[in-house]
Regions:
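Acidic, serine/threonine- and proline-rich low-complexity intrinsically disordered segments
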Residues: 439-572, 578, 583-754, 796-875, ...
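C-terminal accessory/binding modules appended to enzymatic or scaffolding proteins
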Residues: 737-802
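Short hydrophobic alpha-helical segments that form membrane-spanning helices or hydrophobic packing faces
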Residues: 417, 577, 769-773
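Short acidic-hydrophobic surface loop/beta-edge motif
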Residues: 105-106, 183-185, 563-568, 572, ...
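Charge-dense polyanion-binding interfaces
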Residues: 136-138, 247-252, 257-263, 428-452, ...
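Extended active-site and interfacial segments that coordinate phosphate-rich ligands
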Residues: 126-142, 296-299, 319, 353, ...
Length: 894
């Protein structure tokens, strides 16, 4: 194993100006560069500067927090410069710290630092940002778990917040961040209001008809189509480009390099053009010459269900529609907006809403952060309520894996948490040998094989059967060997690639160039965190390397695990369609959930397949667990041992025992005592004890809980004391375990309580009584059929020593419970469906046997079900009685 530094590269120069600084939190690395350029510009005329410049400077100089809500193109980012001048002065020293540009010796002198959400969360977590600092949150509406943690940690540190947002309802942020004012600005020009139409279709290809495209060509329009998936962007661009060669078509999504959009961003794209993009791709891009927007009314978002994030297809919210339409609505003369939806959307009535938060779906990140700081999740004022069940589940998992102990990170946990990777990859890096570091680090740098490749990929020569991880590794290794080499970016070593060669390589294989470049960036960051030199080349995948990788996974197992498409808790999970793993066997990797067309959450997994013998070797063998099996009458006390692997039971062995294992003698006595208390023990005193227990429980109810309760827990403790010194099952069978009722209630008290009436006479018939405790009050319930309910008179009821309640039996239907006859009649007259919806019905069979003393059989004066028969003939008979009667009829002897 290698030594893991406990200080990340971003914190190796922790100093800061004495008077505080401005920390700008950007959503992406690209946004960091944009903000850095914007802070360096002066004298730029913008909508915000023209309409609210003096107001922004006044608020910035007063020291209070505030927000700016404005649409795209109004100059939100450029407003950071005048804000900084009011707070830190005109001598601005600005720098960027992110995964690409680490901290330098000059970092402590910067009075304006631009960081990504991950760096900001780390600095807040380690107290490198204090109350003297001001946080500017750019694009705060782009919610993420990291950003939401930054907001909570910033509030805990006492920081001042200035936030910039696109068109959303600002009421939440105003209250949550204690903002003095919110400046709202818009570049909307009523004279340039777009024509907005809703097309009754959700298929963009159906909408892009010949008529529409001829309209685009005739007017030489610039069209942007926003769709929810990467595949849709490529499909649209391909379909239109093949049919209409006079329309310049292009697509863009998160897997493509930003250089692909250069003609559109710089106004060099020839009209007419059509650009298909994912909704996420449109956020901070100003496309020149755009006058037509087509919006597919769909988005894939993570919805938290039962503590797990489920990828769900939902209609777009008002915020998303307004932001996309705002590209042309009120900004471009003759603009057109088309919304492809089967819903009825009244565009003029759409109003901004509060953003959707993501933190509830990442309880593990919250647990690690809180453990590092030594605080509880309750101590953080999170912007969204945390799923407590999922949070506690994450804490237990982290404790079991040795990362958390006593609500603090262990030494192992600190090594894992400091690395710039997710927790599973951090564990693998900490526990791997140095020769496997290149494999682990690169696999950690690639999001997934599915996100790395297109649907029509051609990667057969690189497939490592049974491992998506190693297949992705092999693709990067080949790209580096053929298209790249060692280089330097911002003075830091990194794998760099020839753009043209890499583009051709990716096009030939169906691999996304952006994923390769992002992997190179992440790989360099990981090696800097490990303080290891970045290798010039990577070893190819061979059988020994594959076996070492599998052994590491089997030994550490930080991922989800599925065996034969089933989880340890019995949930069915399918192998991902794009995975190179087989359906059967052991697969370890990332388990993701998605919502199918019926709304049901389904799981899929991709990762690496492991041989059974590897997990067998790594499985834990329990020393044996004492169990009590009532199904084994001769020897119910048994010793069970099992071979388990992270929740899966691979094998088990069970054998009968007589002598108690010395280290489990107390557990054996507890199990036997529990069996005696529940009445399932095979002991000579068990039968008589069951009768006494039933009587003691009835006495407890009749006494109004004045006597000692004979619950299962109390009886278990009683028999544990009686079994003290017993060391084998044979001694247990010989022990005197007859229940002494006098220890629970004196004999005279038991006799008095059992003399209380067990039945009540109403209208000449007797009905059973049930004694009970309800809301701390002793009551007695009369069980009567529904037809008797309407014959009773409240004034003619006998006096009882406690309140009389009613249970009305209604044949095969659910019974009714009421505190009075009037209430019982009112409930009985209401529709059953209404009572069921209000939870006023109880399952209580009409043939329930009453306490001892209650008369059984048909009531006096009422015929039995056997019409015309004698009363004795209508009663049930035993099989032995019927057999003797048949024998007599045949002339046999009795």
């Amino acid at each position: 194993m290698i030594q893991i530094p406990t200080i990340p590269p971003s914190e190796r120069y922790p100093g800061r100006p004495a008077d505080g600084r401005l920390v700008v939190i950007a959503p992406t690395r690209a946004a960091c560069e944009t903000i850095e350029l914007g802070v360096g510009l002066v004298g730029i005329e913008t909508v915000i500067e023209r309409e609210h410049g003096s107001e922004i400077r006044r608020l910035a100089s007063q020291g209070s927090g505030f927000g700016i809500v404005a649409g795209t193109g109004t100059g939100k980012t450029l407003a950071i410069r005048p804000i900084a001048e009011e707070i830190v002065g005109t001598q601005i020293r600005v720098g960027v710290v992110n995964r690409e540009r680490e901290a330098t010796p000059e970092t402590p002198t910067w009075n304006v630092v631009i960081v990504t959400t991950g760096i900001a969360r780390r600095w807040l977590q380690d107290d490198l940002i204090g109350p003297e600092d001001t946080l500017i949150v750019d694009e705060i509406h782009q919610t993420s778990a990291e950003l939401e943690l930054c907001l909570a940690l910033g509030k805990r540190a006492g920081c001042r917040f200035i936030w910039l947002s696109a068109t959303v309802d600002p009421s939440f942020y105003r209250e949550y961040l204690d903002s003095a004012e919110v400046i709202e600005s818009s570049a909307f020009d009523p004279a340039k209001a777009a024509t907005v139409r809703v097309a009754n279709t959700t298929n963009p290809l159906n909408f892009l008809s010949e008529r529409f495209l001829r309209h685009v060509m005739k007017e030489k329009r610039g069209v942007a189509i926003f769709v929810p998936t990467r595949a849709s962007t490529e499909q649209i661009a391909s379909a239109v480009g093949e049919r209409w060669d006079r329309i310049f078509t292009q697509f863009y999504h998160g897997g493509e390099p930003i250089t692909k959009l250069r003609p559109f961003l710089e106004g060099e794209a020839e009209h007419p053009y059509l650009l298909s993009m994912t909704a996420a791709g449109q956020s901070a891009l100003n496309i020149q010459g755009l006058d037509t927007v087509v919006i597919e009314d769909a988005q894939f978002t993570t919805v938290v269900r039962g503590g797990k994030g489920v990828l769900t297809r939902l209609p777009l919210g008002a915020n998303e529609i307004l932001q996309m339409a705002g590209r042309v609505h009120g900004r471009v003369a003759g603009g057109e907006v088309w919304i492809l939806s089967e819903r009825e959307i009244d565009f003029p009535s759409l109003k901004p809403t509060e953003p959707n938060f993501q933190l509830a779906g990442d309880p593990e990140r919250v647990a690690m952060t809180c453990a590092d700081m030594g605080v509880r999740a309750d101590d953080l004022d999170l912007p969204v309520a945390l799923d407590r069940i999922a949070y506690q589940r994450s804490v237990r998992m982290l404790e079991e894996r040795g990362l958390i102990f006593g609500n603090r990170l262990t030494e192992y946990g600190r090594k894992v948490e400091v690395l710039p990777v997710d927790r599973p990859w951090g564990e693998l890096l900490v526990q791997s040998d140095e020769k496997l570091i290149p494999v682990v680090a690169l696999c950690a740098s690639i999001e997934s094989l599915h996100r790395m490749t297109r649907a029509d990929r051609r990667i057969e020569p690189y497939i490592v059967p049974g491992s998506d991880h190693l297949t992705a590794y092999a693709l990067y290794q080949d790209a580096l060997q053929n298209c790249g080499g060692m280089g330097s970016v911002y003075g830091l070593p990194r794998h760099v690639f020839n753009p043209e060669a890499l583009a051709d390589w990716g096009e030939e294989r169906g691999v996304l160039v952006r994923s390769v470049e992002d992997a190179a960036l992440a790989l360099a960051s990981i090696y800097r965190s490990l303080e290891l030199p970045l290798p010039h080349s990577l070893p190819p995948v061979r059988k020994p390397l594959e076996a070492e990788w599998q052994r590491l996974l089997a030994r550490v197992m930080p991922f989800d695990i599925v065996i034969d498409e089933e989880t340890a808790w019995g949930e069915e999970v399918r192998v991902s369609q794009t995975s190179v793993c087989g359906r059967w066997g052991v697969i370890v990797g990332d388990l993701r959930y998605f919502s199918d067309r019926t709304g049901r959450a389904r799981g899929s997994i991709e990762g690496t397949q492991l041989p059974h013998d590897m997990i067998w070797e790594a499985a834990a063998v329990s020393g044996g667990e004492v169990t009590y099996d009532p199904g084994q009458r001769r020897s119910p006390l048994r010793l069970r041992s099992a071979r388990t692997y992270f929740g899966f039971e691979l094998d088990s062995d069970e054998r009968a025992i007589d002598s108690f294992p010395p280290d489990q003698a107390d557990e054996a006595r507890r199990l036997l005592s529990q069996a005696m208390a529940s009445g399932v023990a095979y002991h000579r005193a068990a039968k008589e004890n069951r009768l006494r227990i039933r009587e003691l429980r009835e006495i407890h109810r009749r006494s109004g809980a004045a006597t000692r309760e004979a619950g299962e827990g109390e009886l278990t403790d009683y028999f544990i004391r009686r079994l003290e010194g017993v060391r084998s099952y044979s001694e247990f069978m010989d022990a005197d375990l007859e229940l002494d009722a006098d220890e629970w209630a004196p004999r005279a008290e038991r006799k008095r309580l059992m003399a209380l009436p067990s039945t009540i006479e109403l209208e000449g018939d007797e009905y059973p009584l049930d004694y009970a405790m309800e809301d701390g009050e002793a009551v007695v319930r009369a069980r009567i059929p529904e037809k008797v309910l309407w014959q009773l008179d409240e004034n003619q009821l006998p006096d009882m020593d406690r309140p009389l309640r009613w249970t009305v039996l209604r044949g095969k239907r659910e019974a009714i419970r009421a505190a009075s006859l009037e209430e019982a009649r009112e409930l009985a007259s209401r529709p059953r469906a209404e009572l069921r919806s209000e939870g006023l019905l109880i399952e209580e069979p009409s043939s329930r046997t009453g306490p001892s003393g209650a008369r059984k059989g048909p009531r006096k004066g009422v015929k039995s079900k056997g019409r015309g028969k004698k009363e004795s003939e209508g009663r049930s008979e035993s099989r032995g009685s019927r057999r003797r009667q048949r024998h007599k009829k045949r002339g046999g002897r009795d």
